[in-house]
Amino acid sequence: MRNLAVFGTASDVGKSVVATALCRIFSNAGLDVAPFKAQNMSNNSGVTPDGLEMGRAQIVQAEAARVVPTADMNPVLLKPNTDTGAQVVLQGKAVANRSARDYFGNTEVWAEAAFESLERLTGRHDLVVIEGAGSCAEMNLYDRDFVNFRTAKEADAPVILVADIDRGGVFAQVAGTLSVIPPEDRARVKGVIINRFRGDSVLFDDGIRILEELSGVPVLGVIPYFRGIHIEAEDAVPLQAVVDPAASPDPGKISIAIVYFPHISNFTDFAVFDLLDDAEVHYLHHPKDLADYDAVILPGSKNVRGDLDWMIFMGWKERLAEYRKRGGIIAGICGGYQMLGISVADPHGLEGEPGETSGLGLLPVHTLLKKEKQLFNAKGCLFDDTIPVEGYEIHMGETRLTGKASPLLQLTARNNRHSSDTDGVISHDEKVFGTYFHGIFDGSAFRGWFLGKLRPDSAVNDTITEKDTEYNRLAEHFLSHLNMGKVYEIIGRGK
């Protein structure tokens, strides 16, 4: 059995979704398949069962493949924390902050670790679906790019090239990519997938013929643009998300406003709300009258003090204070929780210049950023209650309660070890709360508690069932439009 690589003509052409679909298709066919991406750049990350950090996109692909996610599936994770720099997570552990220039100055250390992980994966699974990064033909970085063709060569993997017809110029995308890469890499490209087609695909039959004549590579499928299949986005708030809407929230739905920080992270915490027919989420850059929203959530941030400064500059502090006075419900997750407090101190300069920044003052807590990152899968229940909660923690802050409020959660386990710690804080009137738990809304019990505070008649879906259903729907969509017989031929397995 050969491995298979999915590369793109550009960023955001749909590589992650194609890889996710293939993982579920191969899994449904009875194959032991695993995902792999040598290097991912994203602030959406999760924690593996053994307490290591990896990109959410590969966790999603592992779920689609029905395998336990491991850090080997995403050995290098870059988490941008400034416009020109990022925290480097190597095989699940944060090792350094690097500027782009420093990182690309010597990529061999990262490549070596990535290929170690790849070797372990290929030894454990029948098939590895490899996702590339960005464009596979960035010629100015080609000699330092270990994520695309160098990984394909290491895995002896044929390549499927994904192009996005929705953005236009699909012929130039494919022909241009294939014309600039070296002949030995071009020879690895065995098929093309045209993604996000709108309209009657029969009208593109001539386009398929022209593409195949131009490239000498078969078109394996034309995948129609789809809506209504909910798969977590990889590294940006999805384009279909409602950002800064001119219209007010729908009064017939539960309306949740999420503050869209410049350095927002783990916005996938809120993907579950997209599965609720009677809920809508608005991502807001700009402050507005919040009176019509049932709740406001401050998400995670990869630069808490920087985003705090941004919020104050934009006028968010005053808007949230007004909303609080009117009895609005405000929640903070991880970095958002830290912002709700009195202050955030960074004496080591982990996220910028050393110093301390005043918070929003909505919870009586102080946060100190420390050098060691905390990575936990955790379980517990609401404090003084039996409502179960699960989530994962990824933070470098230690937050102390210093005033009149109560812990939000009573923990029972962290990384499968007993814990009697508490997490988070909730105000005495239960209108403002914060927690370090990412994924907390995925649990139906906690989600029901939260939605019940907003509107008592809120319906609750089962997230796990929904997720599996969505992966199967995605696989069915691709199976209807993809020549899987040719794909199996490409990987050396007749079907």
Swiss-Prot record:
Pathway: Cofactor biosynthesis; adenosylcobalamin biosynthesis. The lineage of its organism: Bacteria, Pseudomonadati, Chlorobiota, Chlorobiia, Chlorobiales. Residues 253-446 form the GATase cobBQ-type domain. It holds the Pfam family GATase_3. The active site is at C334, H438. Belongs to the CobB/CobQ family. CobQ subfamily. Disulfide bonds: none annotated. This is Cobyric acid synthase. GO terms for molecular function: ABC-type vitamin B12 transporter activity; catalytic activity. Signal peptide: none annotated. PANTHER family: COBYRIC ACID SYNTHASE, DETHIOBIOTIN SYNTHETASE. Keywords: Cobalamin biosynthesis, Glutamine amidotransferase. One of its GO terms (biological process) is cobalamin biosynthetic process. InterPro entries: Class_I_gatase-like, CobQ/CobB/MinD/ParA_Nub-bd_dom, CobQ_GATase1, CobQ_N, CobQ_synth, GATase_3, P-loop_NTPase. Catalyzes amidations at positions B, D, E, and G on adenosylcobyrinic A,C-diamide. NH(2) groups are provided by glutamine, and one molecule of ATP is hydrogenolyzed for each amidation. It comes from the Bacteria. The gene is cobQ.
